[in-house]
Amino acid sequence: LNTSGSDAVFTPSAALDHFREYRIQIGTGITDLSGNFLDGSSETSFETLGNVVISPADPEGMILISGGRFMMGADSQTDSDAEANEGPVHSVTLKSPFFISDHEVTVGEYKACVDAGECSQPGSGTYSDNLSLPVNKVSWVQANEFAQWKTSQASKTYRLCTSAEWEYAARAGTTTPWSFPEDANPQDYAWYDSNNKVPYGTGPKRVKTKLPNAFGLYDVHGNLREWVQDFSSDDYSADANGVTDPKGPLQSDNRVTRGGYYSESRKKMRSSHREPKTETTKYVGVGIRICRRPLMGIFFNTI
């Protein structure tokens, strides 16, 4: 255990077993470089998936995922559905842990921000009375308003996920087009054009009604597309030799949405697929998933 600034960093002294649950308890008396100390014991748990460490969702549904390395994107050599802006496949290193929500922001969650006067209304005709539906027809600007409001409500920093964080979490350790097993029925994991018809009706469905991926995230494939921080790019050629903590180009006419939505085909739901839209667009198939920076606590060095 090492303290640096206001963070306590746990580095295993030996390799951890994969697919195991571990518990860590820190006793009183540990002091960081600023002189802050624990006045009581602290305990956390996590499980390992490959070289990735995750912690169970907190009461808000936020899941802590360690940093790690993965192959981002897709190309026609490995995926016949790959589009030009998904390649080349390249190595990405995420150095820091981050929280990501296990669900898309709901109408109820977004309505609280609207009622507080900090978020503007979604596009007309989409603001359902069903508070457990994911909020849709919100722009990238509105998604950021929501994250900023969440930050103002607690001593926690909420934000949109980077595109790399999103894909890392959506893939959940897989290298296949979707994060569910290849022999699984996609309809068990996603709302998309094959199961969002009569008698189900059309439109987004209540969050967390399908199976989650291996990291515990629901609806990363289908239901709604999700805004991420990044400006869009024509491809990943600038990152072809590998990159650490990428945040996309510095400027572009569009932002990126990920994940596919309820009336799109399976190929649009692939983990690597990304769709550009202007940041003021309020599209019926786009919603929000948020990330959060960890507070002082246990960080996991796995790379």
Task: Annotate each language-model stretch with its function.
Residues I30, F46, I65, F70-M72, ...:
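Bulky hydrophobic/aromatic "packing anchor" residues in well-ordered structure
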Residues A8-V9, L16-H18, R23-V53:
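Acidic, Ser/Thr/Gly/Pro-rich low-complexity segments and short DxT(G/T)-type signature motifs
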Residues N2-S4:
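Blade-terminus and WD-like Trp-Asp/Gly-His loop motifs, strongest in beta-propeller folds
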